[in-house]
């Protein structure tokens, strides 16, 4: 399946629009992971823990997006947008949402 942020796919003709679709992932952050990530951030390093969790959430959101497109009979997704949000009173949850338009291409 082709997934792109652009509205068109070069060299391909869109023959049917199946609708707007979305995929989301919400992950809770572990207290100890948060503590060590905060310490690393204070000394100027990158937080590998958060980067891995972010990648995992993004993967889940895109898998859900592709699954919904297939259920509609689409073979591509155009106009993909991805958003990140920190949720919860103590910012203990991460939400990644992806949306786009499911289409059929030749």
UniProtKB/Swiss-Prot annotation:
Sequence similarity: Belongs to the UPF0145 family.
Alphabetized HAMAP family for the sequence: UPF0145 (MF_00338)
Domain of life: Bacteria
PANTHER family membership: UPF0145 PROTEIN YBJQ
Native source organism of the sequence: Vibrio vulnificus (strain YJ016)
Protein name: UPF0145 protein VVA0283
Gene3D superfamilies tied to this protein: Hypothetical protein apc22750. Chain B (3.30.110.70)
Pfam families recorded: YbjQ_1
């Amino acid at each position: 399946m082709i997934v792109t942020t652009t509205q068109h796919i070069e060299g391909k003709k869109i023959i049917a629009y199946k609708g707007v679709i979305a995929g989301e992932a919400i992950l809770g952050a572990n207290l100890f992971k948060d503590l060590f990530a905060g310490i690393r951030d204070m000394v100027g390093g990158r937080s590998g823990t958060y980067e891995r969790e972010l990648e995992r959430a993004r993967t889940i959101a895109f898998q859900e997006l592709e699954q919904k497109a297939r259920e509609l009979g689409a073979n591509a997704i155009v106009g993909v947008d991805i958003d990140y949000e920190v949720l919860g009173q103590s910012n203990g949850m991460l939400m990644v949402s992806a949306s786009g338009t499911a289409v059929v291409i030749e």
